[in-house]
Amino acid sequence: MVKEIYKKYSIVKDLFSRADDVLGFRLSNIILNGPTAKINLTENTQPAIFVVSYSLFTLIKKEFNINLNQAKFFAGHSLGEFSALACANSLSFDDTVLLLNQRGKSMQVAVPAGQGGMLVVLGKDIDYID
């Protein structure tokens, strides 16, 4: 889905390009074309999710003329906190991209590729899960 938005809106292309410049590699190519193995490396996943979410926020704000400057607060969970901070202008786009790349590298070192995982269980009580 982001590929179509990327193609259609120059503001999104510009932010993807800016992230590429900040990082010194083509994160945009990884986001748009993969391969999956590269996007699944958390050093890429972290800034990629941010770049996409921040691009969509900026698109809504500027292209569709929605005034989000009146927002009383921005919130996010985990990685989303960084998007919220950048959208609230508490962190710059460039600093957030670099920070999340480093955060991803640190997380990757803590859990080597192919080890560990994540699971979500919805709608079951604890006795069923045990």
Residue ranges and their predicted role:
Residues 53, 72-76, 80, 84, ...:
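Gly/Ala-rich beta-loop-alpha elbow adjacent to hydrolase catalytic centers
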Residues 36-37, 73-79, 104, 116-120:
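Short, glycine/charge-rich beta-strand/loop segments that flank catalytic centers
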Residues 1-75, 124:
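Helix-rich "cap/lid" substructures immediately adjacent to catalytic or cofactor-binding pockets
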Residues 56, 81-82, 106, 126:
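A short acidic, glycine/proline-enriched capping/turn motif at secondary-structure boundaries
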Residues 21-25, 87-130:
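Alpha/beta catalytic cores of group-transfer enzymes, especially the acyltransferase/condensing modules
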Residues 14, 48, 78-79, 91, ...:
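An amphipathic alpha-helix/helix-turn recognition signal
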